[in-house]
Amino acid sequence: MSNFNDLTDPTDLNDGHDVHDGGQLTEQALRRRHAARGRSATGRAEATCRYVGIPSDAAEVVPTGPASRAAHAVRLSVRALARLPESSPDPAADARCARNASAAAVVAAQMAREHGDTALSEAAFHAAMAASRAAGEAAGRDGMGRDEPLNAKADAAEAAAVAAAKRAGWI
């Protein structure tokens, strides 16, 4: 599993060095951006699982309960992110990878919400849901991983989800 403290803030990724003449980010730059958002969401999910006491070995191929579902979702996200470098950059696929990681973080957030049962836990859960929705929009048919406003919205929502998880004590 990854170390959440080593993750890059996804809002710091668009530094302008990887743009085409038309001002569009290159596919490699988009990959780095989506991968960073995916790593952040996966790290958030891992930290949340640790918070509620779900060990990484709780993952099951066919999950039978909430804990195994959360651990399995995290494991799949970690594997998908690790395999990104094996393929050519594909903004749509890379954005879907980040979306899936964000969805894994929602599964973990559901567990933490029930575990913490505080206003901060509720807010962190809703921030996780918002990050997942924004990641889905960035990866969806309208964004296909290339739409700058949708990517920026997803990056900001991920950063907000991290901040909310920290306030809730999940991270």
Functional labels for PLM-detected ranges:
Residues 117:
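Active-site beta-strand/loop architecture of penicillin-binding DD-peptidases
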